[in-house]
């Protein structure tokens, strides 16, 4: 994100229709033409004197000075015909993306004037259609026509023009009621109030008041060398199914029939749905024949998880987690992924679980900490840690060492860890999160760092503030190499960790996740440990018909609870 520079900023304002330009006809609002002519009469949208002096065309307007040395000029491109946004489809949004592509080199940014009813769908669709976007695209509209005495349209449109003209925010955004949202994170939440949109799971990219506040850390970074790519081959045979208590399996079956290729299924709470066998069977049959189903919560905030058995059942039926995506974003993403040519079904499913345009926050994504080597920060830290001779310097160094050691271990930076050792640092100290460097290295799967720390004699069974051991973190991260090193050094799961493993083992068995079961066994867990309902992983696998898992577990029945071998000789099926 950067502040736009230059004496003039040229924008293209694409008017598709919507309430902002509507007029009353026979007592109802219908799309109204001639928006540029209306804006020309409003001094806040057009400096007639400056336009006359510049000899601007009729469709190009100029805002009053936005700053001392900068003017924002904008050309209004009116679609023919105009649309009520309720009539918009993927085809119209593809045309809109292609319009932006045609004019991409002529303008510094783009404002799309769109009806509010489907604006969140439009913003989500455009975010996936426009790849490698390096200019600002903002959708806006109004709840009341702009020519009305009391209208939100004037503030919304002016705010969108100012944001697109003054800042380079290389995303598809939505501006409404003084807030700039990431487009694929926004949803409409009110039919009448001016604060019609919100971004339930991500803070606004910017807020406008007496000052403009940009949340710079949220703005996505782009590759400055990549050119804009417009994806026009969006799959149109996708749908949205909202579950409700008691929904008949026959209704679900009817909905999931061809030619449907993908479904966003809105579920209860954190991704839960009815666990009736006939309904789960319909979902399983559909996913096994290649239908892609994405699970999104119908709650406004929060994410889909498998904390509950009902959510686990959805995953077991082949339904893909939508994490914290809005339904609008999930539908757009599904359309985009299924529309890409030449991809296997497995690759498409994998793409749906990845963050492609900032549309979701996968729970596996952890904060990345930079390496302490090879950068300016590393040089400054090395200098700071080498300070001695004063009480203040020693106190500062001692306070920083635990966090720096954990950062180095998390990055797998053995050289930085060795540098800390040479300065006399204790690599067994805990950081502000209550974790040791061994926790950080185990979580990241860094075998070299783990080896180095074990050679330094750190406590292999140390617990963090949550009671987690490095071994448990390695199991959760599925790092068999690290698990083997820790086990050889005497690591073991605690009684609490083993007791809580039962439910997780059942979840893995239900999902036919052999890799997950193997790392637990390698860590010394009893795979016969029952879950919260008293059933074991073997019982769950048998009930789910996961024969490979059943065979694996039965092969271990004679050695349940025994010491697991090293990772090189894990049992297979």
From Swiss-Prot:
The active site is at 19 (acyl-ester intermediate). It holds the Pfam family Asparaginase_C. It is an enzyme of class 3 (hydrolase). Residues 41-350 are annotated as: Asparaginase. Substrate binds at residues 84-86, 116-117. CDD domains: L-asparaginase_I. The keyword Electron transport does not apply. PROSITE patterns: ANK_REP_REGION, ANK_REPEAT, ASN_GLN_ASE_2, ASN_GLN_ASE_3. Keywords: Acyltransferase, ANK repeat, Hydrolase, Lipid degradation, Lipid metabolism, Repeat, Transferase. It catalyses: a 1-acyl-sn-glycero-3-phosphocholine + H2O = sn-glycerol 3-phosphocholine + a fatty acid + H(+); L-asparagine + H2O = L-aspartate + NH4(+); a 1-O-alkyl-2-acetyl-sn-glycero-3-phosphocholine + H2O = a 1-O-alkyl-sn-glycero-3-phosphocholine + acetate + H(+); 1-hexadecanoyl-sn-glycero-3-phosphocholine + H2O = sn-glycerol 3-phosphocholine + hexadecanoate + H(+). It comes from the Eukaryota. Its EC number is 3.1.1.5, 3.5.1.1, 3.1.1.47. GO terms for molecular function: 1-alkyl-2-acetylglycerophosphocholine esterase activity; acyltransferase activity, transferring groups other than amino-acyl groups; asparaginase activity; lysophospholipase activity. ANK repeats lie at residues 141-170, 399-429, 433-462, 466-495, 533-562. InterPro entries: Ankyrin_rpt, Ankyrin_rpt-contain_sf, AsnA_fam, Asp/glu_Ase-like_sf, Asparaginase/glutaminase-like, Asparaginase/glutaminase_AS2, Asparaginase_C, L-asparaginase_C. Monomer. In the N-terminal section; belongs to the asparaginase 1 family. PANTHER family: 60 KDA LYSOPHOSPHOLIPASE, L-ASPARAGINASE. Exhibits lysophospholipase, transacylase, PAF acetylhydrolase and asparaginase activities. Can catalyze three types of transacylation reactions: (1) acyl transfer from 1-acyl-sn-glycero-3-phosphocholine (1-acyl-GPC) to the sn-1(3) positions of glycerol and 2-acylglycerol (sn-1 to -1(3) transfer), (2) acyl transfer from 1-acyl-GPC to the sn-2 positions of 1-acyl-GPC, 1-acyl-sn-glycero-3-phosphoethanolamine (1-acyl-GPE), and other lysophospholipids (sn-1 to -2 transfer) and (3) acyl transfer from 2-acyl-GPC to the sn-1 position of 2-acyl-GPC and 2-acyl-GPE (sn-2 to -1 transfer). This is 60 kDa lysophospholipase. It comes from Homo sapiens. The gene is ASPG.
């Amino acid at each position: 994100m950067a502040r736009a520079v230059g004496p003039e900023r040229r924008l293209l304002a694409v008017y598709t229709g919507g309430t902002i330009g509507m007029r009353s006809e026979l007592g109802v609002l219908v799309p109204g033409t001639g928006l540029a002519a209306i804006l020309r009469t409003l001094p806040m949208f057009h400096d007639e004197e400056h336009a006359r002096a510049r000899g601007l065309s009729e469709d190009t307007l100029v805002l009053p000075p936005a700053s001392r040395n900068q003017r924002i000029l904008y050309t209004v491109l009116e679609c023919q015909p105009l649309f009520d946004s309720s009539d918009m489809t993927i085809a119209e949004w593809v045309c809109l993306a292609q319009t932006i592509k045609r004019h991409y080199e002529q303008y510094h940014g783009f404002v799309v004037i769109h009806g509010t009813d489907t604006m969140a769908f439009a913003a989500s669709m455009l975010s996936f259609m426009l790849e490698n976007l390096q200019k600002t695209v903002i959708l806006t509209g109004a709840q009341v026509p702009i020519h009305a005495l009391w209208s939100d349209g004037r503030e919304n449109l002016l705010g969108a023009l100012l944001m697109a003209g003054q800042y380079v925010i290389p995303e598809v955004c939505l501006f409404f009621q003084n807030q700039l949202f990431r487009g694929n994170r926004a949803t409409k939440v009110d039919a009448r109030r001016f604060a019609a949109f919100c971004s339930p799971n991500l803070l606004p990219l910017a807020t406008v008041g007496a000052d403009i506040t940009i949340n710079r850390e949220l703005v996505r970074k782009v590759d400055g060398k990549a050119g804009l790519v417009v994806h026009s081959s969006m799959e149109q045979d996708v749908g949205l199914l909202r579950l409700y208590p008691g929904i008949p399996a026959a209704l679900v079956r009817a909905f999931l029939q061809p030619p449907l290729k993908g479904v966003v299924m809105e579920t209860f709470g954190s991704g839960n749905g009815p666990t009736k066998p006939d309904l789960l069977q319909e979902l399983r049959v559909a996913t096994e024949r290649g239908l892609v189903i994405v699970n999104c919560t119908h709650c406004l905030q929060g994410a889909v998880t498998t904390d509950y058995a009902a959510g686990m059942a959805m995953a077991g039926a082949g339904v893909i987690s939508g994490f914290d995506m809005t339904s609008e974003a999930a539908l757009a993403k599904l359309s985009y992924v299924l529309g890409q040519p030449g991809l296997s079904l497995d690759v498409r499913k994998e793409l749906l679980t990845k963050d492609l345009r900032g549309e979701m926050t996968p729970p596996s994504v952890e904060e990345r900490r930079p390496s302490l080597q090879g950068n300016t920060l590393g040089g400054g830290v090395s200098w700071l840690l080498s300070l001695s001779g004063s009480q203040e310097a020693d106190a500062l160094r001692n306070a920083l060492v635990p966090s720096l050691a954990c950062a180095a271990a998390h990055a797998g930076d053995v050289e930085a860890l060795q540098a800390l050792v040479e300065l006399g640092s204790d690599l067994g100290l805990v950081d502000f999160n209550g974790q040791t460097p061994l926790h950080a290295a185990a979580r990241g799967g860094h075998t070299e760092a783990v080896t180095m720390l074990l050679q330094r004699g750190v406590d292999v069974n140390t617990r963090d503030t949550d009671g987690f051991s490095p071994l448990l973190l390695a199991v959760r991260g599925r790092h068999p190499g690290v698990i083997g090193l820790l086990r050889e050094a005497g690591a073991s799961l605690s009684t609490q960790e083993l007791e809580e493993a039962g439910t997780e083992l059942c979840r893995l068995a239900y999902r036919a996740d052999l890799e997950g079961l193997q790392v637990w066994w390698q860590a010394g867990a009893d795979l016969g440990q029952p879950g919260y309902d008293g059933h074991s992983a073997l019982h769950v696998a048998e009930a789910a018909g996961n024969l490979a898992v059943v065979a694996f577990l039965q092969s271990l029945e004679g050695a349940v609870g025994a010491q697991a071998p090293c990772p090189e000789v894990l049992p297979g099926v």
